[in-house]
Amino acid sequence: VNTSVPSLARRLDSVRSSAIRDLLALTARDDVISLAGGLPDTDLIPVQRIRRAAEDVLAQSSSVQYGETSGWRALRAVLAQRESRLLQRTIAATEVVITHGSQQALTLVAQALLDPGAIVVVDEPAYTGALQVFSIADADIRPIPITADGMDTDELARRLGAGLRPTLVHTVSNFHNPRGVTMSTSRRRHLAALAEQYGFWILEDDPYGEIWFDTPPPPPIASYSDRVVRLSSASKILAPALRVGWLVAPEPVCKAVELLKQGADLCGSTLTQQMATQMLADSVWLDAHLNTVRAEYGNRARALCHEFVDAFGDRAQLSSADGGMFVWMTFGDGTDTTALLPRALDHGVAFVPGRAFADNALHASSARLCFASSPTPALAEAVRRLRAAHALER
């Protein structure tokens, strides 16, 4: 019997496994406090409300049938209303497509808009899931540095003036993954104006926009241009296992995505989409739930930053923690975080090294820390362990 493995498609040659997904397998030990994953806290997932929604939906036998490729109509209507309020312009339900998490939306948009070799501009450092998608699409990925107020649109403008012609610009506009920063209003306006001037699409990835601590973020980039595809998700505000994400885009893009989705999965889960509809439409409950999540994550973010300053002083810098799930840490003494990670794991703490998000030595001394998944006492212990590991590494 011939047991040799058949050759795989060449498109996989340039695709790397997500360092974060690989790291999660290493950190699944009970003795490790993980600051590595981007997981919401299980204790803050509204399990009882999800159970009630499931019971209500399952009372109708039709809830377990196939559905429309573009998603459950009532959910699209609810999301269109929410987006209309955010963007301060009318969004129709036909401009919304429901996907199997926002990662599928990212994949389908890349398939719809990118030919092989198309230029895609990304943040540096960048969301690793986006880098994977664009690599699979055989895109020519061009990083633009991210600053304290988002993508450096001045640098982007300079490169555009020098002849760069991207098809797509991807950015995480609110509480960036991994940098933790939020794009300023002026940067948003500038990026939108550049898209209009040079004719590229903006992919505004926004899974964290609802998780603000003190003040909401500025209006979305899509408020200033219709050359924007917005992505978001119920994973961070309701539950990852629902696998409900969505995109908001002009109808021609939505129709192209729907066509591709037909071939990908026919349709999503009508069961979980109906459950999500019920919860997202219940504005009184949802506002109270989001306020609980914001308050708890805000407390954790402040606690992590406080413990970090106490432990490391001016030997390390942290990004601001105004929302989302992450802070970006940089050692001032040149510590290589990739080399530090094995020692940190020996001490029972995990993080994601900066080089996982950018192939650039500038980020070798940085790391992404997630404060959302662990209660405050565990965060304090995680910093203590990290300090001990760092002391031995020096």
Where in the sequence are the language-model features?
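Conserved core of the PLP fold type I
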Residues: 59-198, 209-229, 297, 377, ...
